[in-house]
Amino acid sequence: MNWDGVFFGSSTGNTEEVAELIANSLNTDLHDIGSPDAIKLIKDSNNIVIGTSTWGDGDLQDDWDDIMSEFQDIDFSGKIVALFGLGDQEGYPETFVDAMREIYDVVLERGAKVVGETSLDGYDFEESIAVVDGKFVGLALDQDNQEDLTESRIEAWCSNLSS
């Protein structure tokens, strides 16, 4: 499958770094959700990857929070969306990658087909609303506690997205 772009919001650079790895693996463009043309680019795309980090007790990253009302107005009918989220399973074990679920709910409600769910194997958290039917709704990453697993998780996930 060809991907039209990876859209991300990043505050500390971790999500941007991961988004770059994913974009390179999928041979597609990288777009900061905070840029003025991001919403238009999403509207004009068919197959997109969306990423966010989770802050505090399950909050969206600031750039996503800023554009969420516009994002919620996008018609995702006919679009394929894959999600990735960053979180801290030791510091916030009860809200691990919860922000990914907020985006998942919006795109699903607005008609997207969501792909790229992943297994819970190898993670150590207490709770996450980003778990649906026993799987994460996308790729869950922990750059704080499991950075050594990030590249292999991205490779496996992107391989599945490409097939």
Language model segments and positions:
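FMN-binding flavodoxin-like domain, especially the glycine-rich phosphate-binding loop
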Residues: W3, N14, S25, D29, ...
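Short, hydrophobic/glycine-enriched beta-strand segments
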Residues: D4-G9
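Glycine-rich NAD(P) Rossmann-fold beta1-alpha1 loop
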Residues: S10-E16
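A short beta-strand-loop structural module common to alpha/beta enzyme folds
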Residues: T28-I39
